[in-house]
């Protein structure tokens, strides 16, 4: 047996002979298969165990993520077996490594309509523990429009959010309240007020602030919304605070969401750790109730960061767009968190565009047609500050939320000054871009000139001018080119 032994299959048996038959011989590898428009396509990176042939390993992934088990079973004869089995139709080596990419097609009938939980259970639910593989990573998916249309998609989307807020032509600005844990509800609200009156559009609960003994959720929300309303009255702008509704049960999450709506909040938040079903459920509630939904990708790096095992974040981005979030954290390029330029730009394309072409440079293995589904607003947060504004706008574009937590609250002249510094930086950079200037090259000079009339910006740049997070990324694109499949 190829999977368990020395890589020599021996004499080929009948497909229906009792016992163990190599996955490739059972039809899970088919080099002649031409994927259908309606197939879900997957690209898996894998490292086989010694003695396991790459084609057999790819076939095993196709089998174990669809209909196969470890031995021949007679009940296969009671199904349209060839229709339902996953089909590995191509295996490519990754140059200079011991890794391979398996391209697998799944018939749409294998998946429940409109369910991220079912799709993820099918494709990644069991196969990642398979002993015949040293490692396995789901790199990308092509989700056909036929299946895309079974999902709600973003509760509102980028354009509707801008219309809600009446804010156009620039990135939106936010800040996560710091310290994330330990503040009283009243002091928490003071941070929100200072940041919003200083020029930010949003403030945010962090992923692990829910309802702890030092600050219960209801108390926090009352003070936060008082701060939001006061800042809106003073500035004449629509403002918001991401109220984190993540809780132990869906009943509690709905209770918190309803209270947020009662208080007049334009936005709520949920953590990725709440699970796919909870996220989809809250997205449906948000569309029904006219509330924006922010997703914090808490916990994602436990399975997205490593190069050879887990799930690439571009897959999570696709799933969350289908699930229906309006915002998702997707990397900064220049901040403290993992994400090289090309990977992050690939994530942003996945979230925002209506049609994405395959692009190996950005790590995009497949084309993706979103069938007019609204886009998701990517969020850049984690170790960014006003002095990087030219880089952020150049790399990430304007349909982005830039969140400066420490870069607002850590300002030497206080929270409002930190917010003002960020607002001035984005305004001058957008103006320069609109005037046709090369902001990537001229950005430092543009900021320096703005510092002459903005003491807040000058202090921010002076404080953080020497701060950088120049570490090599653990994951950069090396996609094996995948031809467009018509």
From Swiss-Prot:
Amino acids binding substrate:
126, 176, 180, 297, 329, 381
Kindly list the biological process annotations in GO that this record carries.
Answer: reductive pentose-phosphate cycle
What does the UniProt cofactor note say?
Binds 1 Mg(2+) ion per subunit.
- Its Enzyme Commission number? 4.1.1.39
Q: Which GO terms describe its molecular function?
A: magnesium ion binding; monooxygenase activity; ribulose-bisphosphate carboxylase activity
Q: Which residues carry this modification: N6-carboxylysine?
A: 204
Q: Which PROSITE patterns match?
A: RUBISCO_LARGE
Q: What else is known?
A: The basic functional RuBisCO is composed of a large chain homodimer in a 'head-to-tail' conformation. In form I RuBisCO this homodimer is arranged in a barrel-like tetramer with the small subunits forming a tetrameric 'cap' on each end of the 'barrel'.
Q: What is this protein called?
A: Ribulose bisphosphate carboxylase large chain
């Amino acid at each position: 047996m190829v999977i368990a032994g020395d890589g020599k299959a021996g004499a080929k048996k009948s497909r229906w002979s009792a016992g163990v038959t190599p996955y490739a011989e059972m039809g899970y590898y088919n080099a002649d298969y031409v994927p259908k428009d309606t197939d879900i396509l997957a690209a898996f990176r894998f490292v086989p165990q010694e003695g396991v042939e790459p084609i057999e390993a790819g076939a095993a992934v196709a089998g174990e993520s669809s209909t196969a088990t470890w031995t021949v079973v007679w009940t296969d004869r009671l199904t349209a077996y060839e229709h339902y089995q996953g089909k590995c139709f191509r295996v490519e080596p990754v140059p200079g490594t011991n890794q391979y990419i398996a391209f697998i097609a799944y018939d749409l009938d294998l998946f429940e309509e409109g369910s991220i939980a079912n799709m993820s259970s099918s494709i990644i639910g069991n196969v990642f523990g398979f002993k015949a593989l040293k490692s396995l990573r789901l790199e990308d998916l092509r989700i056909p429009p036929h299946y895309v249309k079974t999902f709600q998609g973003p509760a509102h989307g980028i354009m509707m959010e801008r219309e809600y807020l009446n804010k156009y032509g620039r990135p939106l600005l936010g800040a996560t309240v710091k310290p994330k844990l330990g503040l009283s509800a009243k002091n928490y609200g003071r941070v929100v007020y200072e940041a919003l009156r200083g020029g930010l559009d949003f403030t945010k609960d962090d992923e692990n602030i829910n309802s702890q003994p030092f600050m219960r959720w209801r108390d926090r929300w009352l003070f936060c919304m008082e701060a939001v309303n006061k800042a809106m009255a003073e500035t004449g702008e629509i403002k918001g605070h991401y109220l984190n509704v993540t809780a132990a049960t869906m009943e509690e999450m709905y209770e918190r969401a309803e209270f947020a709506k009662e208080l007049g909040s334009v936005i709520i938040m949920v953590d990725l750790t709440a699970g796919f079903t909870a996220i989809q459920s809250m997205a449906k509630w948000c569309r029904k109730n006219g509330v924006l939904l922010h997703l914090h990708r808490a916990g994602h790096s436990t399975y997205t960061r490593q190069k050879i095992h887990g799930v690439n974040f571009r897959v999570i981005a696709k799933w969350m767009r289908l699930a229906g979030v309006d915002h998702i954290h997707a990397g900064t390029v220049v901040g403290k968190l993992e994400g090289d330029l090309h990977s992050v730009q690939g994530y942003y394309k996945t979230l925002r565009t209506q049609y994405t072409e395959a692009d190996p440079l950005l790590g995009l293995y497949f084309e993706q047609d979103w069938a007019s589904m609204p886009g998701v607003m990517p969020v850049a947060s984690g170790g960014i500050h006003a002095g990087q504004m030219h880089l952020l706008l150049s790399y990430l574009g304007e349909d982005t939320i830039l969140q400066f937590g420490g870069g607002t609250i850590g300002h030497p002249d206080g929270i409002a000054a930190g917010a003002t510094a960020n607002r001035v930086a984005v305004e001058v950079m957008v103006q320069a871009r609109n005037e046709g200037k090369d902001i990537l090259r001229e950005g430092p000079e543009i900021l320096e000139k703005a510092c002459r009339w903005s003491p807040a910006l000058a202090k921010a740049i002076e404080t953080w001018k020497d701060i950088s997070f120049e570490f090599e990324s653990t994951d950069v694109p090396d996609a094996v080119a995948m031809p467009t499949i018509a």
